[in-house]
């Protein structure tokens, strides 16, 4: 073959036969068992996570990253511009891993957790401005310095990316389309999952008969930046906290700590599907749990595992 600009079937027949027999390989669970039927992880494809402020977008992304480090030894590079100082972000990750605040852990637990987080997480200096190219160049620099290969990257929030509108005649839609294309290419050539976290646009409030007003879940074309996200996305996830004044499809009122994970787009075929499932926040452990076959499961737990009980009393002393 003279070049790689195009392919005849004969160039890919071996790969085709392998794929037809085995399908997608190396598909991984997010560690949240209730999501496995609609959402799985596949390296080489980006994930876009959206939601309103205070919906838990960052928390959900951190949960996936902690889970995949525990389950598969995955390593992560994170830009988190709205998570406080770098030490605050590390504190959050340590709390998730320990399932209790760092200062409540004994010295042995602290050392073990520090080693785990140090081995698997690098946090970018969010006081610096990054274009998407500069961000991925920084990821490559860290890989070279630490002699590691990152399995995921995360840029949160998307609107912190340095805008280069002058290259696109001042058109934000063209700039956005180009950035999302670069993210797609980055995931593919690096065989990793590049995560972008985005806000939603303004959603019109709904008023119930009793006068109660609430914001419904945003549609896929109601993310900040518009339908370009929908067009460019592979996996598109909305994190939504339903109001307790509403009931779910089974007629049961939503719980105060309930979050709906809504898969609004799923590509490639075979790794998920459009749908939704609820997960529940345990503020004390800083982790999510869910239900599978009516059994309570924390992240990384399976049906046969021993179950911890969630902390849902928000007035309870932490420890």
Task: Spell out what each predicted region is.
Residues 81, 199, 241:
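Cofactor-binding loop segments of dinucleotide-utilizing enzymes, especially the Rossmann-like FAD-
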Residues 160, 201-202:
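Signature of the SF2 helicase/ATPase Hel1-core->accessory helical subdomain module
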Residues 47-49, 77-79, 122-124, 195, ...:
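Hydrophobic/aromatic beta-strand patches that form the interior of the parallel beta-sheet core
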Residues 2-99, 318:
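The Walker A/P-loop phosphate-binding site
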Residues 167-183, 193-197, 244:
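A short alpha/beta connector and helix-capping loop motif
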Residues 78, 154-155, 192-199:
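Structural recognition of the conserved hydrophobic beta-strand(s) that form the central parallel beta-sheet
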Residues 30, 72-170, 178, 306-314, ...:
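Conserved inter-motif catalytic segment of the P-loop NTP-binding fold
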Residues 1-14, 20-21, 53, 110-116, ...:
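C-terminal regions of RecA-like/P-loop NTPase motor modules
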